[in-house]
């Protein structure tokens, strides 16, 4: 039940920026519930976790791109399922990398793989599906994304991943007690670094 709540929180936080004007800031911590879900599942040794993250991506795609069904219902359903499958592959590679890499490296790899996938999808793929590029969540919050003229929407995707991973890292440090072993300078650097990203 807890994992389902995290999935629905992820869907809510990541859908609103694409549906409601001026809510792009929600994307800055929208992936945290999905990362928490993955952490809980890993700590519990759960099997078939892909069902949870694939379901999360299907729901997110369905909520934000439901309008494609106005053109063709079959095409809309296929687009939702196929795009969610691709997102799930990226997330699955991240989960697999956690078996090989330790510390923060799998999380950095997750951000890199996601942005590389978005870049491929925008430029080289036969089908372009730019609606759910993470950086596009600020499409109606232009005042926060003036620097997009230099980085494009993928720079926004990097910003979103940096914020999500930074917040998740702070939450993990607090929950496992490592935050309390940091000296004052390390705490100030961690909190200050996260605030600078915001």
Would you name each region that the model predicts?
Residues 1-198:
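Membrane-embedded alpha-helical bundles of multi-pass enzymes
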